[in-house]
Amino acid sequence: MELYYLITISDRDRAEMLSAIYHAAGTGMVLTKLGRGTATGEQLSSYGLDATEKAVVSTVADAEQTRQIFRAAKRKLFIDIPGNGVMMAIPLKSVAGGRTLGFLTDSTQT
């Protein structure tokens, strides 16, 4: 079973929609962390931008769920267009212990 750690960084007002996309694909656990952009005040003012609050939404998904999530994020949130956020999938090559694997996959694979 291929597992991926999915991470999406986007504006906070999109966090609820991202979480809904993750849940619709059948992921069991979604973690949302609040953050802020890393640009300095000088950088923001030189480009005429305002500071934005961010949300980091993450989950663990199998290969099919990962494809569904990426497809839905492209269609609904236009995540593949610059300025709408960043989404990445990090492959999990090993998981220590059967219980951990069961927890991450909602006991579908132990």
Kindly label every feature range from the protein language model.
Residues 1-110:
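Positively charged, small/polar-rich N-terminal and surface patches that mediate targeting and assembly
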